Amino acid sequence: MSQTRPTRAEPPETRADVGAATRADLIAAGRRLFGQRGYDGASIRAITREAGTNLGAVTYHFKSKRGLYAAVLEQGLRPIAARVDAAVRSEGTSLDRMLRVVEAYFEHFEEHPDLPHLLLQEVAAGKQPPDVVLEIIRGVKEAIAGLQVEGIADGSVRAGHPVLTALSVMSQPIYLALVAPLLRTVGPVDLAHPSMRRLALEHTLAFVRAGLTPARNEIHR
């Protein structure tokens, strides 16, 4: 007769586990409601109701609604900053790596289509983003601007203002992702469709390549 081994009881959730889960629920709820209603339109009451937490949870975990908003944006931006960093550190000429930055943005916005609107709604309203957002954006800007400087040295990128070049490269995928709903109506360009999304990526890569490749008479100056 076989003996059944006693099952080991699952360890109870610790207070830290519960706190981390609550924090994650609040960030997810905040991301949904900030995206739908904007910062001013998303109340703490609505966010905690959406997250299934008590009203004081936002203050406990984030100090304020602004603190939660900063955490939401940081969660969205850190991964794209990491992707850009990986592209910048990859092999190839500066132009090759600049094009990989564009691809990184397209890939991230395909996975997180809400992010451009979430990020830029405060900017469009004339408000200053949270400090952590500015820190991440500065880091990305400096990484891409560094490619411009390297590209001038290796001959793969034409001379130009490094910061303006970085902003131009970033703006292409951000703008397309931001206006995607409008493009479906006036295009008709449906960036949710894989073939159209691929076409948009190839078009943007060609556009950036043409803008950054030095003319023949510039290469040996």
Show where each model-derived region lies:
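C-terminal peripheral helix-coil segments that are non-catalytic and often amphipathic
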Residues: M1-E10, E107, E111, K141-D154, ...
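Helix-turn-helix
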Residues: A21, D25, A29, L33-G67, ...
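Short, structured helix-loop boundary elements
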Residues: R23, I44, R66, A70, ...
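Short secondary-structure transition hinges
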Residues: G67, A82, E107-V149, L164, ...
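Amphipathic alpha-helical linker/stalk segments
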Residues: A70-R100, E135, I144-L147
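Helical hydrophobic small-molecule/effector-binding pocket
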Residues: R78, D96-Q121, P130-D131, P173-P181, ...
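Hydrophobic alpha-helical connector segments
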Residues: D85-H117, D154, P162-V169, L201, ...
